[in-house]
C-alpha cells in the first residue's frame, strides 16, 4: 500500500477536529487525538493504515504532550507500517480497541516482510490502553509448516510490534496474540518497560516468541503472562541490565539467553536478573545458549525463585547450540567461544518431564566457570530420580542440590583449565549488581 504524506495544512485541519485540552494556567498542555478523526473506519475490513500514519504524524509534530487513542469497541486493520521519530514531545498511544493485521502474507509483497507495526527512533513513548494487537498469523504459520524450507519461511515472517533505536518506551497492559513470528521486539533500545502483558499464540505456532530483546539496555519485563510457540522471553545480541520478574511462561520454549556468538560475532549479555517465575509445560526452563566460534561473554546472570512444572529441560547451558553456524570464528579457529560464567541458580524447584533436569554442556575451548547452584530441588514427574549432566562446567553448590550436582570445583579450573573463567570485564566489588 502506498501511504500518502499529507500536507501540514491538512494535518492542521484534521487536528482541528480533535479535542485539545489546554487548561488555563495548567503546568502542562495536553492534546487528545483519536484515530477516527483521521478517517479510520474501524470495521476490521477497511484498510485504516493511512489514518494511523496521519494521526501519528500529527501527534509527532505537536509541541505538547499528546494522547493518541485507538477507540474501544472497534477493530482497525493496519497493514505494514513504520512510525518514525524523533517527535517533539511525549506521546501516549492508548490502544483501547483492536489493531489487527491483514490475514494474507501477500500484503507484505514489495515491502519489508520482517515488520508489521514498526516504531523507529522514537523517545518518550507509552503504549497502553488494555486493547488487543492481533497478528492473525495463521497463514504465516501454514507457510512455515508446509514449506520445504520451513525454518526459512518462519524466519521471513514479520515481527508484530517492533521498536528499533528507541529510548524511554513503555508497553503496558495490552494483549498481544497470534503474531506472525515475534510478538514484541526491542532492538537497540534503552530504558524499556514491558509490563502487565498477556501474550498468547498456539503452542505449535512456529517461532512465536513472546518478547525478544536485541542489543538493548535497562529493560524491565514484569508481571506478564506468556503462552506461545517459541521462547517466552529471548535475550540476544549485546544486552545489559535486564530485569525479568513475576512471569508466567508456558507452553513454549521457556526463557532463553542466546544464541550468542552466531556467525562468529561478538556478543555480551551481562547483568541479567530473573526471579519470581512460574514455568510450566515447556520444552526448556531457563537456558543459556551460545554458538561455536563466537566471542564475548554471558555473565552476571541470576535465576532465582523459579517454580518449574513438567518442564522437559529445566536448567540448561548449551555452548554448542547449532551445527549450522557458518560464520568465520572471531578468534582462533576451533578455539574461540563465548565465555559463560558467573551464573547463579537460586531456589529453583519443581518437576522435570525428562530424566535429565540439569545440563551444563560447556565448551572445550572456553569451559563454563563460576556457576553456582543454591537450594535447587528438581524431581522427575511421576516420581523417580532426575539427573544432572556436566561437560567442562565449573562452580560450587550451596545448600541441598537435587539432583546431585556434577559441577567441578573452581580450584580445578586454575590447575587444569586455565582458559576457563576468562571472563571479560571487572568482576570485583559488584556482588550486588
Give the location of each predicted region.
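Extracellular/periplasmic carbohydrate-active domains that bind, remodel
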Residues: 2-433
